[in-house]
From Swiss-Prot:
This is UMP-CMP kinase. It is an enzyme of class 2 (transferase). It comes from Bos taurus. Its main location: nucleus. Belongs to the adenylate kinase family. UMP-CMP kinase subfamily. Keywords: Acetylation, ATP-binding, Cytoplasm, Kinase, Nucleotide-binding, Nucleus, Phosphoprotein, Pyrimidine biosynthesis, Transferase. PROSITE patterns: ADENYLATE_KINASE (PS00113). The modification Phosphoserine is found at S33, S180. Binds 1 Mg(2+) ion per monomer.
Length: 196
């Protein structure tokens, strides 16, 4: 069976992680966060990519696509090897730019199907406030205002065009993510119930 993938996109603080956790619980998807995989890999002393990832994350830059895709593939392969029924994946925070998308199409063409793109649309100021709140407890080095301004710029320049591209293909399911967690999840449920 081929992996069925839903790409989850939205700016920093749009609530991607929070909503993904709920989707996993309700629909049995496996959640793969590109950012988390990279952060874990960065901490792994045996990783060949660790230092490289560290440098990119510190500078608020997007990590080279080969690294991200190899981590995503590894996770999907391991999940499906352990349980063949588990072939539904939420991939969160990817593809983040044109390069990511081309890399995915080149590497994963025919190997995985993208069902749709779940787009959490959220006003920048709300996103920044949420991240600053999260930064107090998350210990994430990039949850500070300066880093956030950079991450939002990167998102607007790089990721938004990808969403527009999928929009043209009729694959985007857009959600107003500025509402409360429960209200947002109600919208998510409508989409997943319809898409199956």
């Amino acid at each position: 069976m081929k992996p069925q993938v839903v790409f989850v996109l939205g700016g920093p603080g749009a609530g991607k992680g929070t909503q993904c956790a709920r989707i996993v619980e309700k629909y049995g998807y496996t959640h793969l966060s590109a950012g988390e995989l990279l952060r874990d890999e960065r901490k792994n002393p045996d990783s060949q990519y660790g230092e490289l990832i560290e440098k990119y994350i510190k500078d608020g830059k997007i990590v080279p696509v080969e690294i991200t895709i190899s981590l995503l593939r590894r996770e999907m392969d391991q999940t499906m090897a352990a349980n063949a029924q588990k072939n539904k994946f939420l991939i969160d925070g990817f593809p983040r730019n044109q390069d990511n998308l081309q890399g995915w199409n080149k590497t994963m063409d025919g190997k995985a199907d993208v069902s749709f793109v779940l787009f959490f649309d959220c006003n920048n100021e709300i996103c920044i406030e949420r991240c600053l709140e999260r930064g107090k407890s998350s210990g994430r080095s990039d949850d500070n205002r300066e880093s956030l301004e950079k991450r939002i710029q990167t998102y607007l320049q790089s990721t938004k065009p990808i969403i527009d591209l999928y929009e043209e293909m009729g694959k985007v399911r857009k959600i107003d993510a500025s509402k409360s967690v429960d209200e947002v999840f109600d919208e998510v449920v409508k989409i997943f119930d319809k898409e199956g």
